Amino acid sequence: MKVRVHELAKKYEIKNKEFLEILKKDIGITVTSHLSNLDEDQVNKIDDYFAKMNMLKVETVEPVKVHKEKKEEKPIRKIMDEDENDEGEGYSQKNNKKAKFQQTKNKKNNNITFEEDGNSHKNKGKKKKGRRTDFILKTVEATPDVVEEDGIKIIKFRGELTLGDFAEKLGVNSAEIIKKLFLKGQMLTINSPITLSMAEDLAADYDVLIEEEQEVELDFGEKFDLEIEDKAADLKERPPVITIMGHVDHGKTSLLDAIRTTNVVGGEAGGITQKIGAYQVERDGKRITFIDTPGHEAFTDMRARGAQVTDIAILVVAADDGVMPQTVEAISHAKVAKVPIIVAVNKIDKPEANPMKVKQELMEHGLVSAEWGGDVEFVEVSAKQKINLDGLLDTILITAEILELKGNNKKRAKGVVLESRLDPKIGPIADILVQEGTLKIGDVIVAGEVQGKVKALLNDKGERVNNATVSQPVEVIGFNNVPDAGDTMYVIQNEQHAKRIVEEVRKERKIQETTKKTISLESLSDQFKHEDLKELNLILRADSKGSVDALRDSLLKLSNDEVAVSIIQAASGAITESDVKLAEAAGAIIIGYNVRPTTKALKEAEVSKVEIRTSGIIYHITEDIEKALAGMLEPEYREEYLGRIEIKKVFKVSKVGNIAGCIVIDGKVKNDSNIRILRDNVVIYEGKLASLKRFKDDAKEVVAGQECGLGVENFNDIKDGDVVEAFEMVEVKRTLK
């Protein structure tokens, strides 16, 4: 009969952690945890050990039976009037403390969904009076944070946990945990985050197990029950969505421009597409949607976002340049997004073009041409000369047919925000790619914590349209604020429903932001106490939210263990007077990307001596900040050998001490040299010279073959025959790389 480790530990009144050590060190039994099973021979061996130690009487231990508790389904709670208190429904009431804890955690982790109740049989045909009951808040049962198995308490560890929350789960006072950590040399507060390893170490003292559990976040639509199931009859063929990827200046935008026969290249800076745009073209009566993603590696996240909404990735590689770093990066994003890749070998019109080299280099990254037995289509094109563009479009349409892409235009629309901005005359504008349904003028829409009503739709040519169907990109005017790029947009039944959803999203994000800010403030305080860590404060301004996100991520990646970038504030729009005042208070530098400071901001910056740096090229900004951070690094020094001196005779000089008569046998010695004294090849002292003389005169430098006299700082035990090594410490310029 098998017995669990914790049962024997309980029997001998020993803590699980100590019991495991005894098993391993003293008895020779290795187990993984308190819940491990022991066979009869092992149990007898343990009993014999403790019998010899004369610790406790041996008692028969019966294995604990596991009783599975039936989970009760959480009831559906309707949203009542604001003054109605429905707190406490659907939560465990086993005991007051546990009920309170369970209630708090469920409120935090339950997934909230909204349902429409207007079609239920019970309410059909009845006129509702009083408060609204057609809008239901449904709670989905969440996994409990604390469970008990075989008499052992198990805490589920999800993501980040504060010390206070962990103490509550353990059922002990926070002060006790703080004291334990203090004795281990860790100073934490009740709001400090704790790591998984810290939690495991602490829990072992209380015979509690920690089980790591990955958080599974439902997306926006699942949380609020906005996803509508498609009927097979409604699914029709839809245009493919294409993302163009590749290295800087390999011709991505030029290729798209050639396909569209419009000029969007001229206004760009530094050869890089700075914003995501989406456009549609037509080939043989079929439409193709192109998403043009930025080409520089700093826009990694924006490119990844483009790959997530795309069906096919076009990898543009210059025939005269071959595979480059951003080419490899683009391949990775396409593979993560699990989308097929078509390689467009561009610039074949150039004399130095070598398409064969491109194919060979891409083979090393898993892209094998269909001609060579692989599954990747290679199309040789020239955007400049408009060579074989039809062949590329045909390849796209053939690939789309194989994928059997379908969409439903007969339901409420769902889309993704590709880009957003605030127009001073029109207001908030969002570039939306419709992914499901049909978006119409007058639709009530929600994207993240922003809502609105569609006032106008503009297609990629800037023409007003009444609706947008699946895979169609449009500019949407009507949001009450600027939505975040990457947010999913949904059409909601009415404005009341939209408002309630936005309120829930706002509350949820506010909780997350508050938690992040608290942790950030604490870590900031710790950093200031830690003198070895230096910080560069920045305020960021850019022309759009997507650019802000890309710039922030690029700059934060420059941080390391010694120097850190701290983003005090980041937003889209012009640099304002308030930005300058904030920078002055925080000791920050203001960075502007594709934006300029206002007149008032410039005057304020001049008075307060706040530095403002602006650029239209993102990598110029990152290079400047990288140089600034490198200057903040503590200098590194390298020892540089100067020479070797042999002591011939030591003279005692009153009021001065011992002076050595020497000869420089190799290299040279300077009057400010660092030295080490060797006796029988053993270093007996290391320090600096106090004096260096030649013919009774002070000397700055003595070279090999010359005699000299020297005195050593704070050392008088020089003897004949000692050897002195002279060296200097040379500062080595450091970089962040």
Swiss-Prot record:
Keyword field: Cytoplasm, GTP-binding, Initiation factor, Nucleotide-binding, Protein biosynthesis
Q: Where is this region: G1?
A: 246-253
Q: Region G5: start and end of each range? A: 382-384
- Predominantly, its location class is cytoplasm
Please state where this protein is localized.
Cytoplasm
List the PANTHER family.
TR-TYPE G DOMAIN-CONTAINING PROTEIN, TRANSLATION INITIATION FACTOR IF-2-RELATED
**Compositional bias annotation for Basic and acidic residues:** 69-80
Domain of life, per UniProt, equals Bacteria
Q: Where is the tr-type G domain?
A: 237-404
From the UniProt entry, list the residue stretches annotated as the region Disordered: 69-130
Q: Which residues are noted in the entry as GTP-binding?
A: 246-253, 292-296, 346-349
Q: Where does this protein have compositionally biased stretches of type Basic residues?
A: 95-108, 121-130
Any one biological process term the GO annotation gives: translational initiation
- A GO term, aspect molecular function: GTP binding
UniProt similarity note: Belongs to the TRAFAC class translation factor GTPase superfamily. Classic translation factor GTPase family. IF-2 subfamily.
Q: Tell whether Iron is among the UniProt keywords.
A: no
Q: Where is this region: G2?
A: 271-275
Return the InterPro entries for the record.
EF-G-like_DII, EFTu-like_2, IF2_II, IF2_N, P-loop_NTPase, Small_GTP-bd, T_Tr_GTP-bd_dom, TF_IF2_bacterial-like
Q: Where do the record's region annotations for G3 lie?
A: 292-295
> In the UniProt record, does the keyword ATP-binding occur?
no
What name goes with this protein? Translation initiation factor IF-2
Q: Per its database record, what is this protein's job?
A: One of the essential components for the initiation of protein synthesis. Protects formylmethionyl-tRNA from spontaneous hydrolysis and promotes its binding to the 30S ribosomal subunits. Also involved in the hydrolysis of GTP during the formation of the 70S ribosomal complex.
- Organism from which the protein derives: Fusobacterium nucleatum subsp. nucleatum (strain ATCC 25586 / DSM 15643 / BCRC 10681 / CIP 101130 / JCM 8532 / KCTC 2640 / LMG 13131 / VPI 4355)
Q: One Pfam family this chain carries?
A: EF-G_D2
Tell me which GO cellular component terms the UniProt record holds.
cytoplasm; cytosol
